[in-house]
């Protein structure tokens, strides 16, 4: 998907500690939203135009819904059309 167009790549380390303030049954969902918000802030794009790779999703959900990792290292690829992809480095 990213090979076809001109792209910009960014390596980020996103802290997900504030997801611990949400209820236990919604921590993984909150972490995905926080991840998208952080990427939207750095790439200056809309949150709806951000695509999360399946491996990143599996990393956040790896220990279940209640025990999310506190920090995630990701690679963001911003495409020319304004969409962004979140993948593992």
UniProtKB/Swiss-Prot annotation:
Any GO CC annotation of this UniProt entry: ribosome
Molecular functions (GO terms): structural constituent of ribosome
InterPro entries assigned: Ribosomal_eL31 (IPR000054), Ribosomal_eL31_CS (IPR020052), Ribosomal_eL31_dom_sf (IPR023621)
Gene3D superfamilies: 3.10.440.10
Pfam assignment, any one: Ribosomal_L31e
Any GO BP: translation
Keywords in alphabetical order: Ribonucleoprotein, Ribosomal protein
CDD domains noted in UniProt: Ribosomal_L31e
Family of this protein: Belongs to the eukaryotic ribosomal protein eL31 family.
Protein name as it appears in the record: Large ribosomal subunit protein eL31
Organism: Picrophilus torridus (strain ATCC 700027 / DSM 9790 / JCM 10055 / NBRC 100828 / KAW 2/3)
Lineage: Archaea, Methanobacteriati, Thermoplasmatota, Thermoplasmata, Thermoplasmatales
Gene name of the record: rpl31e
């Amino acid at each position: 998907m990213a090979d076809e167009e001109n792209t910009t790549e960014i390596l980020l380390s996103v802290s997900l500690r504030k997801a611990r303030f949400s209820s236990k049954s919604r921590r993984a969902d909150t972490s995905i939203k926080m991840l998208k918000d952080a990427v939207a802030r750095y790439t200056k794009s809309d949150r709806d135009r951000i695509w999360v790779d399946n491996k990143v999703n599996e990393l956040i959900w790896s220990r279940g819904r209640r025990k999310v990792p506190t920090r995630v290292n990701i690679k963001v690829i911003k495409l020319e059309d304004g969409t962004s992809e979140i993948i593992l480095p």
